């Protein structure tokens, strides 16, 4: 079973990837005619990732794109991700430590709904206050063991 921070990290990475897909660099990609949806999605994932050269090297980009895309630099990604704000995060269980809030903040989270009930709720609240986040305790855990 994944820990709560692993779940928060994964959710943050998914939100970041979704937001990167909305960037002008990705939205402006010109795919070759007839390229299937799965191939487009895979090309986008590789293009946004650290191994972007796999789809940009000569002999490869021509299979996917009409025009060779410019590299989507780490600086450009960071700048674009900074614009992702007012994200909402919901959790089916309480956050046991403030590190979950720290990670959520990196992905633009501003609003959190969670059951509450951790012995460290005060630490979690303090971290939310530090980033001017709004957190609501629902009082309801949404899973069974």
Q: Where in this protein do the model-derived segments appear?
A:
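Feature captures the catalytic cores and cofactor-binding loops of soluble hydro-lyases/lyases
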Residues: 2-145
